[in-house]
């Protein structure tokens, strides 16, 4: 499976035969604002995931060594996610694990880097490393890309409001 798509400013690269994928997205906001939107639970729940999803935080300790957990709900049910923040470098980098409670044996590692593009713009580059090629391909097939696109569009609107 080789996928390299650009939907609504999200670039998703899914290299064939690897356990990883790359996501790149530019935002019209400074790195500190994009970082805060990822670390502040009150902001995170407003933009994370597809349009029809609502999120509830169960645990949120946004620091190196801290844990996080939330539940996403839609008309079809609820979906729990959890992980640990392995590295939090303010306005620069977030390294965390990510586990969907429906597949507890499939732990992913996410590495997010924020790059200041100047003029109040930020590039968010994210690498997600899955436990297997099959897990990665399953997440992509389940609609991961549309969730990312819709979530980042909601984040754009939130940042435009001054968050």
Task: Locate each region found by the language model.
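A conserved amphipathic terminal alpha-helix motif
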Residues: 1-6, 87, 130-163
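Intrinsic-disorder/low-complexity, polar/charged segments enriched in Ser/Thr/Lys/Arg/Asp/Glu/Gln
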Residues: 18-24, 55, 67, 80, ...
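Beta-strand/loop substructures that line and gate deep hydrophobic ligand-binding cavities in soluble
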Residues: 20, 95-149
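Short beta-edge strand/loop motif at the mouth of beta-sheet-based domains
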Residues: 22-23, 42-78
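Hydrophobic/aromatic beta-strand elements that line small-molecule binding cavities or substrate pockets
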Residues: 24-25, 57-60, 81-87, 98, ...
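Hydrophobic pocket/interface hotspot
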Residues: 34-35, 44, 68, 85, ...
